[in-house]
From Swiss-Prot:
Region feature Disordered, mapped onto this chain: 1-85
Family named by the database record: Belongs to the universal ribosomal protein uS5 family.
Gene3D superfamilies: 3.30.160.20, 3.30.230.10
Alphabetical keyword list: Ribonucleoprotein, Ribosomal protein, RNA-binding, rRNA-binding
Source domain of life: Bacteria
One Pfam entry name: Ribosomal_S5_C
GO molecular function, one term: structural constituent of ribosome
Functional note: With S4 and S12 plays an important role in translational accuracy.
Quaternary organization: Part of the 30S ribosomal subunit. Contacts proteins S4 and S8.
Positions of the S5 DRBM domain: 89-152
Biological process terms in GO annotation: translation
Comp. bias regions, Basic and acidic residues: 1-21, 34-46
Name assigned to this protein: Small ribosomal subunit protein uS5
Amino acid sequence: MPIDKKQEKNFTNKIQEEGQKSLDTSLTQEIEILEEKLNKNPDHKGTINTTPNDNSTSKNSKDKDFKFKKKTNSQNFKKNANKKPEKEFEEKIVNIARVTNVVKGGRRFSFAAVVVVGDKKGRVGYGHGKALEVPDAIKKAVKDAQNNLIRVPIINKSTVPHEQWAKFLASKVMLKPAPKGKGIIASNSVRAVVELAGYTDIYTKSYGSRSKENVVKAVFDALKKLRYAEDIAKMRDLDIKDL
């Protein structure tokens, strides 16, 4: 049967009314729920909480701190790696010479180095090294010098206790105390030994052969003979005043 226009309108109106009723009921239910919440929490304003949870913030902060620590640790490690360790002894090269060794097949060339080592606090030593390359010869000389250290007396933290002469082969050396502020008066080879021993004011004089290695050995012979006044008094069974 064909449907009248009136019936069709009535049908649509019914559907719209039912839909409106369902909407109204759902809205009233939601309003009631919100009112209950407001009654329970009067401070609650019904705003949407956009701030993150405490757990999430703490996690993020921990992650940031961890990353920052990682960076700082790596930076500190790099800084420490770049830092050079402080050396106990200072080194000075006195002489480097090219040496030939004649063998059956011909000549063999090598390098010889003389190095002085000291801590500027009363310990000093010298060494001799020989190798096919200059760096290797210097390393050997440094090791030899560290194995041949001697301790020397220093008066007033600046000079030798008394005048001393020494001789090695054709080289002769004199060491003499100097007043404070005078400085080191010496040749290059003698200065290397005296500075690294810890003397800051001293007179020196060298005679005879100018061979650098022989002069260094003569200086070491003179340093070995140096004594404190107390030691000399004990050896002679005397008071320091009687010397």
